[in-house]
Regions:
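Catalytic machinery of carbohydrate-active enzymes
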Residues: 1-227
């Protein structure tokens, strides 16, 4: 899969990947059907890791604009899930991640299954989870492949960027979708990249203004669909 940020003349891609989504751009390059289809996983061990019902979460990301920047969001979600009788399993690579003066921690109350572990282990956790709650990140794609319902929290990407999930959270009343804006060039070296509102009170408002109540509504819909 090729992501060509500066291909203004469409030499390497017939349409800009930001307009068609990460998982469709290769299809456009190859000239095949761009309809999305989750890959099928064949795990050598398909057994459950714990007997109780549980939810997987992943809160970390490679850049701050991907995070859910609501300061109390994850804490409130974990508390809500535990009240519903779920164990909450965090399957990030790291329990803490960030840069300079900005660091993001595993939410209080979540069980720590972070670490440099095989993706097959992550997939096994996801396969038996009631659902997954996470960001526009690799573990969300792995959950999709595992056949697990995904509650996604993302504001810096437009929904076209990822696979479809009925449980996506985005706030259309704030700045949003800068990643999919051809006018903005993502800076892989700026962890605090926010092209429209950097160093202003509006920085990262795309996810900061996604409320826990909004996410809980999507979680409730996922729970209802499972019942």
């Amino acid at each position: 899969m090729g992501l060509f940020f500066d291909d203004k003349e469409n030499v390497f891609q017939p349409t800009d990947f930001r307009l068609v989504g990460l998982h469709r751009t290769a299809a456009y390059i190859l000239g095949v059907d761009p309809a999305e289809e989750a890959p099928k996983l064949a795990l050598s061990d398909e057994t459950r890791l714990i007997a109780e019902k549980y939810v997987c979460i992943a809160v970390q990301a490679s850049t701050q604009c991907k995070y859910w920047n609501n300061p109390t969001g994850w804490m409130e979600i974990v508390a809500y899930l535990k009240k519903q009788g779920y164990r909450v399993i965090c399957i990030d690579q790291r329990p803490v991640h960030g840069t300079a003066i900005v660091w993001n921690h595993i939410p209080y109350g979540a069980e720590d299954q972070t670490g440099n572990r095989p993706l097959t282990e992550r997939a096994r956790w996801l396969r038996h989870a009631e659902f997954f709650i996470g960001l526009s990140s690799g573990l969300a794609w792995l959950a999709w492949a595992a056949g697990t319902p995904v509650v996604m929290i993302s504001g810096f990407t437009h929904p076209i960027n990822e696979f479809y999930t009925p449980y996506r959270n985005i706030n259309w009343h704030t700045c949003n979708s800068c990643w999919n804006d051809e006018r903005e060039r993502f800076d892989h070296h700026d962890f605090l990249w926010c092209p429209r509102h950097a160093n202003t009170p509006r920085q990262f408002e795309c996810t900061r203004l996604i409320t826990s109540q909004q996410v809980i509504a999507k979680i409730s819909a996922a729970i209802h669909a499972l019942s």
